Amino acid sequence: MPRAQLPEDSSAVDMDILFPLDSVIGTELCPSPIPQIIHFVLFVVFSLVILIILRLYIPREPSSVPPREEDSENDQAEVGEWLRIGNKYITLKDYRILLKELENLEIYTFLSKKCLKKLSREGSSHHLPRQVRPGPVYKPAPARNHRPRGGRGKASPTSFHVSPRAPLAPLASMPSSVPKTSVESLGSPSSLSSSKPREPLCPLKHPSHQPPASTLSPNPTSSTESLGYLSSLSSSQPPEPLRPLKHPSHKPRGRSLPRRRNPGWVSWSDSMQADSETDTIICPMCKAPERSCPHTWWVPSSPRVIRGVGRCSDPNLGLSWRQEAARAWCHCTSSQFPFKHPNLPTHLPKASF
């Protein structure tokens, strides 16, 4: 290939001297495997170096398989985290958990021994819970079976179910089926009152101040028995001095219905009169103050209980204990006091039934 001729005065440099193109092209086109092997070796070396560097900074996860016993330093470091018990390997964390469980077990055994000592000291009378005691078991009878059934106080044989644990009711609480009467004419009313339920007590019409319910007797008797008993007491015992009442009779407020007066009985509200100016009690017989009056017996000092008075099956037959006392005193002292009072009877009237 002919080269171009350059002028002499030109400063051009020959390119073949600076860049031998023919030699470079020839080396690239020749098929030799040496440079490829060198390139592969260099790539592998650089990759291994990079992996080693990254391994130091990446955290390693613990393996679940126990390490093998080898003499290398890495294997000895891994064995330090594992504990060998017999033929088994456990980690340090599991070992600490086992220690805590053993401590709790010791505490539980100590508490159980303490409870057993207490039970042995108290004795064998204390039974453990849910333990069946020997002996027959009795069921308590219902409350409705304790009252007798049927009329006239005749109870059926199956009306009472007595259990050994249930306390027996007292006989005083049982209602008496037949009232105690001495008059034969009261036979039919007493039988009717025993078969029918008891009626509530009606308030008395004549006395203004009624005695409390605690002074009444639960066993009903006739009025004739109470009169005979009271007259026998008044004849055998001397009359005691009676004190005046501090509080006058309680009068209801507002309008009240007119009361039916019986001339044969003493009205206690009429016999007690209080002077509003001097606040003294006036005797109904001599119209004198209580201090200067010789009849100091007409005011009761303390309430006396008369069995059977004021409580009867018929409300019209109920008598006040104060009326009974006034009648008895008037009957006994009629011979001692010659004066007469229109409200006090001179003879004992017959009881009307």
Swiss-Prot record:
The keyword Transport does not apply. It is a single-pass membrane protein. Residues 122-271 are annotated as: Disordered. Residues 211-221 have a biased composition (Polar residues). The chain crosses the membrane at residues 34-54. Residues 182-195, 222-237 have a biased composition (Low complexity). Keywords: Membrane, Transmembrane, Transmembrane helix. Residues 244-262 have a biased composition (Basic residues). Its main location: membrane. It is found in: Membrane. GO terms for cellular component: membrane. Belongs to the SPATA31 family. This is Putative protein SPATA31J1. It comes from Homo sapiens (Human).
